[in-house]
Amino acid sequence: MNMDHSSHSTMSSSSSMTMTMVFTNSHDTPLFSSAWTPSSSGAYAGTCIFLVVLAIINRCLVAFKASMEHYWFATHLNRRYIAIAGKSSEAGRIDTDPDAKVASLVTAQGVEESVKVVRRVSREPIPWRFSVDLPRAAIFLCITGVSYLLMLAVMTMNVGYFCSVLAGAFLGELAVGRYIQWNEHDH
């Protein structure tokens, strides 16, 4: 009998420690801190609009990163030059032919050389470059920060905040989703 009583008290104390996870539609749910607690319906609507805009910004940042990744990869592939010996300068022809792959290059010594741009088709990783990897990391930092802010908004379990984040994600994807590549390694 004593065993039943102790197991019952342990059970009731552990169940009272759990938090019920239900959505609420309270208009005074704090967002990010107690200082940001809507006090009226208008303030609540403004907070929801802010979350929609923040979710749109998140999708725009992801699309911007995908666009920059494409640009950085294309720049990497076109970075190689081969000097063409015995060729005359073709600067005049280059100006009139938009499809020309031959260009003039002025070297560090001030000598004009004719070069041919060779596109690399290899799938090896791009070498580390400060001019590429620092902006990439900064963009990723922004994406991560905004994503965590959106996650914290959803974790308030407020229906309005949750729907606002979903609406912003939908509108952002609708606007810029075509620029986002899901497989980052398939360039």
From Swiss-Prot:
Entry GO CC: plasma membrane
Induction line: Expression is up-regulated by copper deficiency and decreased dramatically when the copper concentration increases. Expression is up-regulated by the deletion of ctrC.
Membrane topology: Multi-pass membrane protein
Protein location: Cell membrane
Keyword Magnesium listed: no
Catalytic activity: Cu(2+)(in) = Cu(2+)(out)
Any one GO MF annotation of this record: copper ion transmembrane transporter activity
Disruption phenotype: Exhibits a reduced copper content and leads to cell decolorization due to lower laccase activity, when ctrC is also deleted.
Primary location recorded for the protein, binned into one broad class: membrane
Transmembrane segments: 44-64, 137-157
Source organism superkingdom: Eukaryota
Residue ranges the record marks as coiled coil: none
Keywords on record: Cell membrane, Copper, Copper transport, Ion transport, Membrane, Transmembrane, Transmembrane helix, Transport
InterPro entries noted in UniProt: Cop_transporter (IPR007274)
Entries under PANTHER family matching the protein: HIGH-AFFINITY COPPER TRANSPORTER CTRA2, SOLUTE CARRIER FAMILY 31 COPPER TRANSPORTERS
Family, as annotated: Belongs to the copper transporter (Ctr) (TC 1.A.56) family. SLC31A subfamily.
Function: High-affinity copper transporter of plasma membrane that mediates copper uptake under low copper conditions. The mechanism driving the transmembrane transport of copper has still to be determined. Acts as a potential virulence factor.
The protein, known as: High-affinity copper transporter ctrA2
